[in-house]
Structure formats: structure tokens, C-alpha cells
A protein has these predicted regions:
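H-loop/switch region of ABC-family ATPase nucleotide-binding domains
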Residues: 209-210
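Conserved catalytic motifs of ABC-family nucleotide-binding domains
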Residues: 170
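H-loop (His-switch) and adjacent beta-strand-loop-beta switch element
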Residues: 222-235
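ABC-family P-loop ATPase nucleotide-binding domains
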Residues: 77, 88-152
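ABC ATPase nucleotide-binding domains
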Residues: 246-272
Length: 272
């Protein structure tokens, strides 16, 4: 049996004097597609940074409270080759960061081998890397974008390129952090359909979001976060009830399920 993707045992992450994750204990199994759902400020971003080892939790008695793929000590770059990551923040850094979108799509995908934003001067790019990058773009329906700069693309096109970047190392897990922020309705649907196919092809999904509509039918488990703690963990039908969502988001909601997706409205006024 493979090791769990993530094991946390009373993990606490502090920013300033405030815990953003507070004695968090949970296990995410391999091949169990999981959504982390909660409002802004619930600790979702801190959870991602903990998973990728950008943040380290407080250790009690010299024992690490976190294990990723069964290990508590990782080289960060080696770990990131096992975790493909797509986020709106990464999108913003590629398009509006230091390179101001000048990175070509093929170079952006190749940068996934180095866990960098673009290819560093000392990075050695092999023919095998170029082949795998081209295959990743093809898989995401973005081969025609290879020679274009990211800032010349629509948000949906750029997000597909970043999805190819996340998959170029054949990671064990795809981490999606608020993945459809900034996408219109059509682009969002197309993006999530590609994510569904990735899940069906065998890559474990970890989806971090505050949008219930992003929870694709392949998600088998939902973890509700509130104020840095697990408020509930269970299957989607058990987690996405009006009572549990009100407890986490602080507002009365109506929940409907259609086509395997969940849709919510604020109770009482019909607003989405």
C-alpha cells in the first residue's frame, strides 16, 4: 500500500502571533481526490504552503508534525517534482511578475522541471524534457500556444499552459489552489473538464477553494476548514449540507446537486 499523500498531527503554523493553522490533524490518502473548502482566512493558503514546504509547522519535542508521501524530510525541489501546482497566484506571477508575461508557453512548461518561474540560466534542458513539455501542451489542447507569450493569451489559454507545466514531471498529485479565479464561465467549465480527465487518468487531486461549484464529481472527500481548524471531514454529500456550510461560512445557504456538481445560493433572497 502506498504512503498517504499527507499526514498532519497537531500541526500549527503561526504568522506573527496568530496561528493560521491550529493543531491541524488529518490524513489525505493517495488516489483519494480531496477538496479543502473554507472561506477567506480559514487557513487554505497556509495549508498549501505547508504541503509544498514553503512553511514549516511548529515541532513538538523535536518531532515533525508533517509527513508527505511518508517522509518528514524533503529536498524542496524534489518534493515539488511530485506535486504539480496550479493557482491564480502562479498565473499572476507568470503574467505580471518580473518577466511581465514575456515567458513563452513552451519555456513556462519546461520551467516545471526546475520548479522555477521560467528557465534559469544554469538550467540544462534535455531533448527528453522538450519532448515531455510538448506532450504536456498537446494533452492540454495547448500545443498551438507553444511559441506565444503568456501575456498575449486569454486567461483560459494561460491557465491551460500552467496546467501543462504542472503535469510535465508526471507528478503523483495535482494541487489546484483557487484554480478558476479570473476565468469566465466557458473557460472555467473547460478547465475543470480537463481536471476531471486528469483525475480519471490516475493523478490524485487536491483542490483548495472557497467555490463549491469547483468541486468536481470525482472528488471523494471534502475537508471543511474554519479558523485554521478542521470543522468537518467526509464525503461530499455529508460535508456540503446547508447546516455545515452555514457553520463554516457564517451564512444560511441552500444547496442543490445537479449533474454531479453542487450549487449554492444564500437562503432567503435567491442570490448566488
Amino acid at each position: 500500500m502506498s504512503s498517504p499523500v499527507l499526514e498532519l498531527s497537531n500541526a500549527t503554523v503561526v504568522r506573527g502571533e496568530r496561528p493560521v493553522l491550529d493543531s491541524l490533524t488529518l490524513t489525505i490518502r493517495a488516489d483519494e481526490h480531496t477538496a479543502i473548502l473554507g472561506p477567506n482566512g480559514a487557513g487554505k493558503s497556509a495549508f498549501v504552503r505547508l504541503l509544498t514546504h514553503e512553511d514549516r509547522p511548529l515541532a513538538a519535542n523535536g518531532t515533525s508534525p508533517i509527513r508527505v508521501f511518508g517522509q518528514d524530510n524533503w529536498d524542496v525541489f524534489e518534493l515539488r517534482s511530485q506535486l504539480g501546482i496550479v493557482s491564480s497566484d502562479l498565473h499572476h506571477r507568470f503574467v505580471f511578475g518580473n518577466n511581465e508575461g514575456r515567458v513563452m508557453a513552451d519555456a513556462a512548461v519546461l520551467s516545471g522541471f526546475f520548479a522555477t518561474q521560467g528557465i534559469l540560466r544554469y538550467g540544462v534542458v534535455t531533448q527528453d524534457m522538450r519532448r515531455r513539455a510538448a506532450e504536456a501542451l498537446e494533452r492540454m489542447g495547448a500545443a498551438h500556444l507553444a511559441g506565444r507569450r503568456l501575456h498575449e493569451m486569454s486567461s483560459g489559454e494561460a491557465r491551460r499552459v500552467l496546467l501543462a507545466r504542472a503535469l510535465v514531471t508526471s507528478p503523483r498529485v495535482l494541487v489546484l489552489d483557487e484554480p478558476t479565479t479570473g476565468l469566465d464561465l466557458v473557460a472555467r467549465h473547460a478547465f475543470m473538464e480537463r481536471v476531471r480527465q486528469i483525475a480519471r487518468d490516475g493523478t490524485t487531486l487536491i483542490l483548495i477553494t472557497h467555490h463549491i461549484e469547483e468541486i468536481v464529481p470525482e472528488i471523494a472527500r471534502v475537508i471543511l476548514l474554519r479558523a485554521g481548524k478542521v470543522a468537518f471531514s467526509g464525503d461530499p454529500d455529508s460535508a456540503l449540507t446547508p447546516e455545515r456550510l452555514q457553520d463554516v461560512f457564517g451564512a444560511a445557504m441552500q444547496v442543490e446537486r445537479s449533474g454531479g456538481y453542487y450549487h449554492v445560493r444564500l437562503a432567503g433572497n435567491g442570490s448566488p
